[in-house]
């Protein structure tokens, strides 16, 4: 028997970008939720400064494991398509450091740790104005 309306919340911490069909998956999860329940999604943000800085070396792309890539506008369209409301967006401040360090390693950079920390800091500083942090947490309501 398929369960319906049995959960108050479902979390997807850096999961959605790995799924072959995000629309199908979100619709499936939505059926599992009670009314006015939440899906919490954390995903890399392709509109972040660290992405524009690193380009093809940006670790947030994580090809081929990441099947999809989102910025806030694309994620909002996805949510509209499946009938979910974005209730809030929360920055993941530490992801810019982690992703930048990995991106420096992708570039085979000398002092990748120090350079990554610096670019991660700059990314967060710029995101204070743009709200485009390296990764974002979306709280969705059905």
Q: Where are the regions that the model predicts?
A:
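Conserved glycine-rich, hydrophobic/aromatic-active-site segments
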Residues: 66
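Short, flexible, glycine/charge-rich loop motifs used to bind or transfer phosphoryl groups or to couple energy/partner
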Residues: 1-2, 56-58, 127-128
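Short glycine/proline- and charge-enriched loop/turn segments
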Residues: 54-63, 102-109
């Amino acid at each position: 028997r398929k369960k319906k309306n049995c959960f108050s919340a479902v979390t997807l911490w850096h999961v959605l970008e790995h799924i072959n069909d995000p629309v199908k998956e979100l619709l499936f999860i939505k059926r599992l939720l009670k009314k006015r329940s939440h899906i919490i999604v954390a995903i890399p943000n392709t509109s972040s400064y660290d992405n524009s800085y690193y380009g093809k070396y940006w670790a947030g792309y994580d090809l081929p494991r990441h099947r999809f890539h989102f910025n806030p506008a694309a994620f909002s369209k996805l949510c509209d398509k499946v009938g979910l409301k974005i209730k809030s967006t929360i920055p993941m401040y530490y992801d810019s450091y982690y992703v930048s360090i990995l991106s420096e390693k992708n570039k085979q950079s000398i002092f990748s740790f120090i350079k990554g920390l610096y670019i991660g800091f700059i990314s967060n500083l710029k995101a204070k104005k743009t709200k485009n942090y390296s990764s974002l947490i979306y709280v969705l309501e059905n």
